[in-house]
C-alpha cells in the first residue's frame, strides 16, 4: 500500500512529526511526501521520496510579534497554486491513503480526486483579539468543515486533561488523541547529564532577543547554556552581540544548526521554547521542564504556554517580560515541582506512544477497507449466483 504524507513547512514542528510517522510506517508501507523549502530538504535526509509543492501561507513577524493577518492574507502565496500542483502529484503517485499535517491544500486536492485522507493537527480552534476576528474565526470554521470530512482528525498530544494544545481545540466527532508524535525513542535511563539550559526557539529571526537575553544571563551568572539559532546568520550576529570569539565558549555554546537535537534535549536541565507544540512535546517526553516565551499575537503558542503553566511543568513568560527570564530560570532550578511534574509527563508519554498509535490506526484503516471490499465482492458474487439460479428455475 502507498501512503503520501503532506507537510506544512511553516515552522519545523510539522516536519519533525511527519518524519516520525514515516519512520513508524516505512517497514510495512511505501511512503512518499509532499513538502517544500527546508522541510523538503530535511525529509530527504531520511531517504524518503519527496514531491515538491508550494506553500499556502508564509509566517510573518517582527520583533517577537507574529502577524497573523499578513501570514494568511499574502500576495506571495496562493492556496490555488498549491492545490493545482498537489492534484498533479496525487494523480502521478496514486496513493492508497493521504496523511496531511496542516496542509489543507492537499486535503482539498485529495477530496477532489476522491482519495481517503487523514488530518493531523494540534489546532482547530483559537481565542483571539477582536481586531482579527473577521479573519481568524471564519478561517477556523472553514477548516473544521474540512476536518470533519476526513477519515480521522488526529491530535498528536496527550489525552485530556493533560493535552498541551487543549485551549486550541474544539472537539469534533472524528477527533482522536494518540500521544506525542516525536522523532526520537525516549530511553528509560534517567541519569542524564542535565548540566545546561537549552534554548530552542526555531529559525525565525524575530525571536532573536530571547537568544541574546539568555546569553547575557548566562555570562552574568556563569550558567551553562546552549543556544540553537536555526541559521548561521543569526548565530554570527549573536556571537558578535555577546562579544564572543567563537561559537563554543566556556559556558555559552552557540549552535547555528543541529542534527543532534535528541542528545541536546536529553542532557538539558531545562528547555527555553517559543511555544511551538512539537518542541513542547519533545521536551515533556524527555521529562524536561520548560520556560515558554510565545511570539506576541500568536494565540496558538500563547495557549500552549498557558497549559504548560497550568500543568505545573513550566513557566510561561510574555515576550515583553524578558526581564523576568533570569528569575524564571532560578525558580525552575530551585522549585522541585516543575521537574517532578515534567517527569510525570514523561511517564505519560511512555503510555501514549504516538508512533505506535498512528501505526495501529493506519493498519486498522487498511484492514477495514479490505474487509469492506471482501464483503461487497462476496455480496456481488452471491447476487449473481442467486439471479442465475432464478433464471434456471424459470
Swiss-Prot record:
EC top class named in words: transferase
The EC designation for this entry is 2.4.-.-
Pfam annotation, one family? Glyco_tran_28_C
The signal peptide annotation in the UniProt record is none
The UniProt keyword set, sorted, is: Glycosyltransferase, Transferase
Q: What are the GO MF terms of this UniProt record? A: glycosyltransferase activity; hexosyltransferase activity
InterPro entries found in the cross-reference section: Glyco_trans_28_C, MJ1255-like
Q: Which family does it belong to?
A: Belongs to the glycosyltransferase 28 family.
Q: What is this protein's record name?
A: Uncharacterized glycosyltransferase MJ1255
Q: Which organism is it from?
A: Methanocaldococcus jannaschii (strain ATCC 43067 / DSM 2661 / JAL-1 / JCM 10045 / NBRC 100440) (Methanococcus jannaschii)
